[in-house]
């Protein structure tokens, strides 16, 4: 359009959601705290069930398949596997965890072997 009524992204697309290209120190800290909180809940549930001589398949499979936050490498904490992001070098097939939808509510601890 010409004149005073030039179109902008905000007018055409509604809200513009800007995602920073890397995680800030505060976001990394909060992400680590969320991972530790999940580990703590799993440990509490597991010990409570063991005291009663019971077990839960879901909790046992979580412990068997997922690393605790203290054992995860920074690459696994802050990036996740994606087929669509194919870059050169170390970041090939990985993208920042904050660029995935609902990254605070979904687990990002499982990656294919070799990636």
From Swiss-Prot:
Component of the mitochondrial large ribosomal subunit (mt-LSU). Mature yeast 74S mitochondrial ribosomes consist of a small (37S) and a large (54S) subunit. The 37S small subunit contains a 15S ribosomal RNA (15S mt-rRNA) and at least 32 different proteins. The 54S large subunit contains a 21S rRNA (21S mt-rRNA) and at least 45 different proteins. Keywords: Mitochondrion, Ribonucleoprotein, Ribosomal protein, Transit peptide. One of its GO terms (cellular component) is mitochondrion. Belongs to the mitochondrion-specific ribosomal protein mL60 family. Residues 103-115 have a biased composition (Polar residues). It holds the Pfam family L31. One of its GO terms (molecular function) is structural constituent of ribosome. This is Large ribosomal subunit protein mL60. It is found in: Mitochondrion.
């Amino acid at each position: 359009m010409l004149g005073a009524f030039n179109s902008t992204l905000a007018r055409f697309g509604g809200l513009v959601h800007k995602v920073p290209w890397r995680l800030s120190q505060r976001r990394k800290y909060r992400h680590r705290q969320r991972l530790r909180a999940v580990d703590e809940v799993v440990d509490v549930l597991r010990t409570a069930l063991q005291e009663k001589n019971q077990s839960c398949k879901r909790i046992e499979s979580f412990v068997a398949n997922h690393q605790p936050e203290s054992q995860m490498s920074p690459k696994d904490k802050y990036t996740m596997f994606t087929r669509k992001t194919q870059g050169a070098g170390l970041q090939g097939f990985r993208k920042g965890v904050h660029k995935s939808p609902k990254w605070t509510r979904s687990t990002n601890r499982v990656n294919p072997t070799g990636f």
